[in-house]
Amino acid sequence: MPVSKREQSKDTGDPCALPKLPIPPLKQTLDMYLTCMGHLVPEDQFRKTKAVVEKFGAPGGVGETLQKKLLERSEQKANWVYDYWLEDMYLNNRLALPVNSSPVMVFHKQNFKGQSDVLRFAANLISGVLEYKALIDGRALPVEHARGQLAGTPLCMDQYNKVFTSYRLPGTKTDTLVAQKSTVMPEPEHIIVACKNQFFVLDVMVNFRRLNEKDLYTQLERIRKMADIEEERQPPIGLLTSDGRTQWAEARNILIKDSTNRDSLDMIERCLCLVCLDEETATELNDSNRALLMLHGGGTDKNGGNRWYDKPMQFVIGADGCCGVVCEHSPFEGIVLVQCSEYLLRYMRGSPSKLVRAASMSELPAPRRLRWKCSPDIQTFLSASADRLQKLVKNLDMNVHKFTGYGKEFIKRQKMSPDAYVQVALQFTFYRCHGRLVPTYESASIRRFQEGRVDNIRSSTPEALAFVKAMASGSKITDAEKMELLWTAIKAQTNYTILAITGMAIDNHLLGLREIAKELKLEKPELFSDTTYATSIHFTLSTSQVPTTEEMFCCYGPVVPNGYGACYNPQTDHILFCVSSFRECAETSSDLFVKTLEGCLKEMQDLCRKCNTEVKPADSTQRMEGNPKVMKNGSKS
């Protein structure tokens, strides 16, 4: 969903100047949980769930005890859910980062005519990265303000501080998000360049002076030549970072027994970012294939080993013009990736000739190749990591589709929220493909609050179900009635969005109640061992709106084996959809979903045209505004 517009502001961006994330009333969350799940599970199961929820929320019950403890936690913490959420969403997850966790930004295809063009692009990009880091360090980034629903509120800028200073350290049971800020160690002043599965240290500060683009180009040229020296070739250790987190942690524990490996790991873990110079792939570089290459590198026979997935920002520059960014998601949200990427593309467009004008340093120290000592155990881990990456590559099914029937301008003319409209369209599509609705995740920014990240907008509402059923073929419902149901579904979606962005949704609250019960070493409350709760957090449809102003798009993989990832980028006259699924699942098909989505969007447009030819602004505004903070169950935010 759209969360930010950038404005010059007197605000400092200091998280402490923002309000704390509120804790919703217990009864409100429990009522809303039942409303969200009643139509998604069998009746018998729901009856049992209702009894479990009533017991949990009863006066003097366990729910009240946990709520009281959460309120106490809120007094002591800047953000009561942040640690719980970070561990649950990312650090405890044992799946491999590529496809399963790390989103990517795919740039417009570049037309490089040779290696010098590639290195010039890379030098220009690195120069932009250093400019952007200087803005972050100098607290000179304009404070962002919310747009869309409840526009104008200043947003927490804390996530930007983690872009170049954090690292996701693998652990056998849980990972650690490491902040590099240290009073003892000097600030990192190097970038790691990956080339032909080798890793090189590129110092960006020499003799207290930042390298200009000519210097960077010279160093990148040296790195390219060093990577070609066969007898110096090191094993593709980057493959280990593409594996499951426990496997990578076990391999790393073996690696660090050797001092050479420790030094190499230290240089990577403390770098600003990675720049991955990829080889040509001999692949047709349409949008879908570029998305796949960005998500997993194409596997071991392409550029799958030319990565280090633990680092938040990896800038990929392919010799064939396939370029973009791979993002380790735990330190920050997609909007930060968008803003950084858009800054870099604007910077590069505005400074194409610096390389020619700049004078180079006469004496530049040679870039350093990172070396590895590989025991037989590490060779075994490498082989297993390569096999698992290949399996992931073969399994991922991606369809990037530009829907050109209309864009957000048409939707706005109907006096509807484009995001709510697209969410209802995705529900319509899933229902038409699978004959049911499922728990759906749409990320909602809670950056209005100190250290705010996201909560979940549950888009599979009862109102959406009523609409999609009415649109089923053979329905005797009139167009006017269908239109009324569409309005109701969009209003319900809009209302839930407002609840989520104001800290009143249910997912973070339920997570907090669950985790504080663990901390208190209480027996797991029945609410969280109930089948309906397991269903509620199995997000078969994982969605996110990631709008861009530059020519690029974001995509990611499904979050469950039988699910879809659906990222969308609404523009004035078209909407770009990136739909992913797994080939191993017989139920899902990205191509079928996209084809069905196209039809559903056209049907919704036809319905709007039939019924909204004379949209009365006053009527439609009243319809959308109504009481936007009141849910169907009467709970208020």
Swiss-Prot record:
<dbReference type="GO" id="GO:0005737">
    <property type="term" value="C:cytoplasm"/>
</dbReference>
<keyword id="KW-0530">Neurotransmitter biosynthesis</keyword>
<dbReference type="GO" id="GO:0004102">
    <property type="term" value="F:choline O-acetyltransferase activity"/>
</dbReference>
<protein>
    <recommendedName>
        <fullName>Choline O-acetyltransferase</fullName>
        <ecNumber>2.3.1.6</ecNumber>
    </recommendedName>
</protein>
<dbReference type="InterPro" id="IPR023213">
    <property type="entry name" value="CAT-like_dom_sf"/>
</dbReference>
<dbReference type="GO" id="GO:0007626">
    <property type="term" value="P:locomotory behavior"/>
</dbReference>
<comment type="similarity">
    <text>Belongs to the carnitine/choline acetyltransferase family.</text>
</comment>
<dbReference type="InterPro" id="IPR039551">
    <property type="entry name" value="Cho/carn_acyl_trans"/>
</dbReference>
<keyword id="KW-0808">Transferase</keyword>
<dbReference type="InterPro" id="IPR000542">
    <property type="entry name" value="Carn_acyl_trans"/>
</dbReference>
<dbReference type="Pfam" id="PF00755">
    <property type="entry name" value="Carn_acyltransf"/>
</dbReference>
<feature type="binding site">
    <location>
        <position position="445"/>
    </location>
    <ligand>
        <name>CoA</name>
    </ligand>
</feature>
<feature type="active site" description="Proton acceptor">
    <location>
        <position position="329"/>
    </location>
</feature>
<feature type="binding site">
    <location>
        <begin position="407"/>
        <end position="419"/>
    </location>
    <ligand>
        <name>CoA</name>
    </ligand>
</feature>
<feature type="region of interest" description="Disordered">
    <location>
        <begin position="1"/>
        <end position="20"/>
    </location>
</feature>
<dbReference type="GO" id="GO:0007274">
    <property type="term" value="P:neuromuscular synaptic transmission"/>
</dbReference>
<feature type="compositionally biased region" description="Basic and acidic residues">
    <location>
        <begin position="1"/>
        <end position="13"/>
    </location>
</feature>
<comment type="function">
    <text>Catalyzes the reversible synthesis of acetylcholine (ACh) from acetyl CoA and choline at cholinergic synapses.</text>
</comment>
<dbReference type="InterPro" id="IPR042231">
    <property type="entry name" value="Cho/carn_acyl_trans_2"/>
</dbReference>
<keyword id="KW-0012">Acyltransferase</keyword>
<dbReference type="GO" id="GO:0043005">
    <property type="term" value="C:neuron projection"/>
</dbReference>
<dbReference type="GO" id="GO:0045202">
    <property type="term" value="C:synapse"/>
</dbReference>
<dbReference type="GO" id="GO:0008292">
    <property type="term" value="P:acetylcholine biosynthetic process"/>
</dbReference>
<feature type="binding site">
    <location>
        <position position="545"/>
    </location>
    <ligand>
        <name>CoA</name>
    </ligand>
</feature>
